[in-house]
Amino acid sequence: MIQTFNELGALRGQIAQWKREGLRVALVPTMGNLHGGHHSLVTLARQYADKVVASIFVNPTQFGPNEDFSRYPRTPEDDVAGLEQVGCDAVWLPSVEAMYPLGVDRTTRMHAPGVSEVLEGASRPGHFDGVCTVVARLFLQVQPDVAVFGRKDYQQLAVIKQMVAELSFPIQIVGADIVRDEDGLAKSSRNQYLSAEQRPVATTIHRTLLGMREGYVAGQARDRIEAEATAALQAAGFQVDYAVLRTPELAEPTFDGGGRVALIAARLGTTRLIDNLEF
């Protein structure tokens, strides 16, 4: 049976017992409202560890002033039931007060310069500071041997890898492949905000990413690829934040050849969607 923890001392006691037994522990951080994509992270984590802990915490420090923290769906009972079905061993459910004992406005914050300041960081200033702040605390609370994050949030994964390397966290960071619906739409908690009419339109994002890859393979100039991608999304009714090609490190390419990642962030109505494709 899955264990749930609301108190840090009890969680640490259980993890200490596992480690005394020589067991490896994996952490899967989430904000709840879980779907198949999240469940795949737990399944992957089981390949790297003997015990899997998922955290559910809607983190106020990563929401911007125009982003409704209170609107984020909270479904803890369903989340725990789903985690149990995929073999999660424990769920950590901290309160805001436990995570930020001095209060959200007075808390010590983390910042990963460079990679956190472009793309999503430019569109959502301070977002990755909040991500780093909460992830660092989760690492200190759970002390996992490995942590699993989805590649759908490609930039978030890059930011966390930078923070872990710079601060020498003794934690292996694993990126999990994007889970998609049959029509290509990446699974996301935000998909539930799409209307019945918007849902098929949202698949334009994945088709556009595939087109960006085709353009790159065909030798098209990056500026042309990005311009055509933006135009395709706008024609479908999206408000585009960015549609870009970057190196795996998220730098602007300075030469042809080498790996690339295409990244898109766009708003359909009031719903902001992100996706990417590595090639």
Regions found by a protein language model. Give the residues of each.
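A residue-level signal for beta-strand positions that form part of recognition/binding surfaces
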Residues: 1-2, 261
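Nucleotidyltransferase catalytic core that binds NTPs
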Residues: 2-238, 246, 270, 277
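A structure-centric signal for secondary-structure junctions around beta-strands
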Residues: 23, 258-259
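Substrate/ligand-engaging "lid" and interaction regions
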Residues: 243
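Short, solvent-exposed loop/turn elements at beta->coil junctions and helix N-caps
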Residues: 246-252
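Short, basic/aromatic-enriched C-terminal tail that caps enzymatic domains
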Residues: 252-255, 261-279
